[in-house]
């Protein structure tokens, strides 16, 4: 885990891509932590990988949830279509995380947080 946080602190595209390689781990807990750290980094370089994790129905729900939240934390509105699509996911943990991410994106853009209707 030290390596994960060390890479986070570098905040470079290279560090971001190195973290994304960690999604090949068998550990769902590690994959969850990587998604969390990528959200903290707020680096759009991670978005393609985070979108893949969210959209992969075989991925652990904990990882999909954290990928959605990280996508919102990054603040790039290009992820709105994926988040909208998965806000209707049958798993409430995933669907609700997508709604939270969409609300965060709306808030960052200056919209009213309470009235956002996705």
Segments from the language model and where they lie:
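Alpha-helical segment of the N-proximal tetratricopeptide repeat
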Residues: 1-11
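Core register positions within helices of long alpha-helical scaffolds
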Residues: 6, 37, 70-73, 101-104, ...
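Short inter-helical turns and helix N-cap capping residues of alpha-solenoid HEAT/ARM repeat scaffolds
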Residues: 26-27, 58-60, 90-91
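Helix-adjacent hinge/juxtasegments
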Residues: 29-44
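Preference for long, well-ordered alpha-helical segments
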Residues: 78-104
């Amino acid at each position: 885990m030290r390596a994960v946080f060390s890479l986070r602190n570098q905040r470079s595209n290279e560090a971001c891509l190195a973290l994304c390689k960690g999604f090949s781990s068998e550990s769902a807990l590690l994959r969850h932590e990587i998604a969390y750290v990528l959200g903290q980094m707020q680096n759009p370089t991670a978005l393609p990988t985070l979108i893949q994790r969210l959209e992969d129905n075989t991925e652990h729900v904990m990882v999909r949830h954290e990928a959605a939240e990280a996508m919102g934390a990054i603040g790039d509105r290009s992820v709105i279509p994926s988040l909208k699509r998965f806000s209707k996911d049958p798993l409430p943990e995933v669907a609700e995380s997508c709604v939270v991410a969409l609300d965060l994106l709306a808030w960052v853009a200056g919209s009213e947080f309470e009235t956002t209707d996705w």
